[in-house]
Amino acid sequence: MCATDWLCYLMQAEPDVDTLISEIVPDLEDLVYDGAIRLDQVYDVMMEVISCAAARPWWVSLRLISVARYQWDILGPELLARGADPNTQSLAAWLDVLLVTILGAMDPKKTTMFLMQLEAVPDVVKDPGKDAFDEMEMDTGAFLSLGG
């Protein structure tokens, strides 16, 4: 799958993991109904699939995508100028260019804090009862405050 295939699900205001799962595993309902897999296991596996496709932890990926969505008017043209093409690149490669673009546009004094926030392990990893998407987004104010 190219980056576009992933981003059409993950770059929405609320990432559409349910539809992504059904696209990747079309027989999922049958597997859950037959008891071959539990629904909570499906989401855990899907987060790992996102991690593999992105070559970084899923929470870092979702936060990067969130920053791109909020700041698309700034980052979109920069990504194009850097040759980032989500139609031909993997999700991992596209996210690499996105991260370099974000860091390049940021005040160097603020990169450490940005990276700490980006890579912070979410509570849902520590406490599986929490909703994974509640704490994944980095709001516009947080991003802009890091830019200088």
Question: Which role does the model predict for each range below?
Answer:
Residues 2-19, 23-148:
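Charged interaction scaffolds used for protein-protein
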